[in-house]
């Protein structure tokens, strides 16, 4: 059994954050909330999503796992206004998710979770540098880099965090000192990342006041931020692009 009611804009943002990684997911539903762990088909990006029961206006659930087509639910939520309430229900033993929004009632067929890629193991990484910055600053730097190159260098040098992109003839670089950041833990960090992934991953951060980046040298980057006034969290782990000498 699962019954819940949640703000439409919050649900849209949560689904959009997952959809940048995969099209289909296994939702783990528990009395304390919902969680998803998924990795993209190329094994380059991983998404970790948690939404506690306090993020919902109403929430009641037994432990279960369901498979969802994110494209279907994204299309369905497209008709909802930002202040609408989305009501969802799942009866025990049913493979249909009932959704009410904007005066419309939908019956959404669920996917068999066993046909969806299994939940990945989250690697334990020792990332020496940590940067906390405003989400809009991160998004701005990535958008600027897109116009120059297909990859971006991110690192920490002393008390400065930098993001840099180089093309054949052009270059863009953003430096932020300790006084321009929300927080900085200095450490040896310099890694190159694909903008094909970064561009989509940072889209949800535009509305976020604090984004935490954990970095190393030629290591994955962990991008972590809260949603739903702290009742939820989204984390991305993105593998670096290693260039041969």
Curated annotation (Swiss-Prot):
It comes from the Archaea. One of its GO terms (biological process) is leading strand elongation. Homotrimer. The subunits circularize to form a toroid; DNA passes through its center. Replication factor C (RFC) is required to load the toroid on the DNA. It comes from Methanosarcina acetivorans (strain ATCC 35395 / DSM 2834 / JCM 12185 / C2A). Belongs to the PCNA family. This is DNA polymerase sliding clamp. One of its GO terms (molecular function) is DNA binding. Keywords: DNA replication, DNA-binding. Sliding clamp subunit that acts as a moving platform for DNA processing. Responsible for tethering the catalytic subunit of DNA polymerase and other proteins to DNA during high-speed replication. SUPFAM superfamilies: DNA clamp (SSF55979).
């Amino acid at each position: 059994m699962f019954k819940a009611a949640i703000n439409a804009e919050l649900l849209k943002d949560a689904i959009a954050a997952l959809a940048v990684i995969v099209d289909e997911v296994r939702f783990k539903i528990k009395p304390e909330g919902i969680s998803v762990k998924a990795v993209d088909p190329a094994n380059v990006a991983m998404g970790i999503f948690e939404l506690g029961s306090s993020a919902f206006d109403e929430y009641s659930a037994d432990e279960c796992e369901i498979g969802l087509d994110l494209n279907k639910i994204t299309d369905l939520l497209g008709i909802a206004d930002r202040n609408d309430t989305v009501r969802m229900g799942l009866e025990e033993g049913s493979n249909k998710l009932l959704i009410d929004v904007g005066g419309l009632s939908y019956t959404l067929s669920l996917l068999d979770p066993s046909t969806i890629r299994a939940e990945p193991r989250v690697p334990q990484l020792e990332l020496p540098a940590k940067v906390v910055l405003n989400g809009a600053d991160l998004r701005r730097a990535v958008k600027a880099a897109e116009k120059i190159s297909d990859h971006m260098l991110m690192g920490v040098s002393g008390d400065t965090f930098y993001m840099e992109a180089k093309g054949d003839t052009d270059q863009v670089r953003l430096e932020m000192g300790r006084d321009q950041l929300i927080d900085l833990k200095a450490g040896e960090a310099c890694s190159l990342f694909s903008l094909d992934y970064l561009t989509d991953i940072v889209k949800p951060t535009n509305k976020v006041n604090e984004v935490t980046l954990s970095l190393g040298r030629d290591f994955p980057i962990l991008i972590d931020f809260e949603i739903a006034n702290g009742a939820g969290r989204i984390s991305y782990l993105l593998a670096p692009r290693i260039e041969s000498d």
